[in-house]
Amino acid sequence: MVVVTHISTSFHQISPSFFHLRLRNPSTTSSSRPKLDGGFALSIRAYIEKPNSFSTFANKVIGSLPVIGLLARIISDEGGVGRDLVDFAEFRKRVGNKCTPDDSRAFYEFQQRRGKAGEPLYVLLCCWVAAVGAGLLKSEEILEGVTRVSISNDLEFEEQNFIALMTEARQRRAKLNIDAPTIPMELRVEKALEGIYACCFRRGLIEEEDEKLLKVMLIAVFPSVEKSEIERIIKEKATRVEEGGEEENVMAKRLPKEAIQMQMKDLEFLQQQNIES
């Protein structure tokens, strides 16, 4: 299998190592990223396991034990037990470890069809924030973030921004003693598809070949969801877009490019203020 070191590759196959790449933007540094205070805890089910499975319960128990939980985090291949957050890098690693050559080829071919906006990292960011943030983030927050990243190409910034928003939402719920709602896996897939459409299609039609590639990619990321259900979700989305039923929703949820750029400047200013204080 070919080891890919850059997104724009001439090979028709993407190895798992592609998904493990750390994100670095030459125009930014780690010092400009928002620093998160301790105390953040989030239950992550996503594509990793079913919400009520025995392994979920066991991981929560193990994670609550100080010494055993620490050892489990060190030796676990997948990393993260109990209520730990699966960050974007870990998410990509897990997806890459489970991807088949056909799965990797689908990511590559999708990029070839959609151009830069269809880069695998963009697709995976949409899947990650849907898997992790559903129930904590508003749909508008997800769509605004994935739309920004298609313009700025700063995935690390958006990851940290999403985490900050989830942290804030989690803390608000903790103060009110309210648990985050349990979001079915099928709805997480729908959220992921909404993000991919906003980021990669820019209100264009979802063609038949796109549907096939989306099905392969979403099954690779969300294997616990029935293939027929994922196919239904994609088909219904494509039909709504073709019939114009999504136009009003897209116009209401997506911000103009200028507004997004202003929003990014505001976020960067607030980050700098936090660092200086």
Swiss-Prot record:
Keyword Chloroplast in annotation: yes
InterPro entries xref list: PSA3 (IPR037736)
Membrane topology: Peripheral membrane protein
Presequence extent in this chain: 1-45
Keywords, comma-separated and alphabetical: Chloroplast, Membrane, Plastid, Thylakoid, Transit peptide
Summary of the knockout phenotype: Seedling lethality when homozygous. Pale green and slow growing phenotype when grown on MS medium supplemented with 2% sucrose.
Claim: Thylakoid is one of the keywords in the record: yes
GO cellular component: chloroplast; chloroplast envelope; chloroplast stroma; chloroplast thylakoid membrane; cytosol; mitochondrion; nucleus; stromal side of plastid thylakoid membrane
BP GO terms, sorted: photosystem I assembly
Described function: Nuclear genome-encoded factor required for the accumulation of photosystem I (PSI). Functions as a PSI biogenesis factor. Cooperates with PYG7 to promote the stable assembly of PSI in the thylakoid membrane. May target primarily the PsaC subunit. Does not seem to be required for the expression of chloroplast genes encoding PSI subunits.
Quaternary structure and interacting proteins, as annotated: Interacts with PYG7.
Protein name (database record): Photosystem I assembly factor PSA3, chloroplastic
Organism of this sequence: Arabidopsis thaliana (Mouse-ear cress)
Lineage: Eukaryota, Viridiplantae, Streptophyta, Embryophyta, Tracheophyta
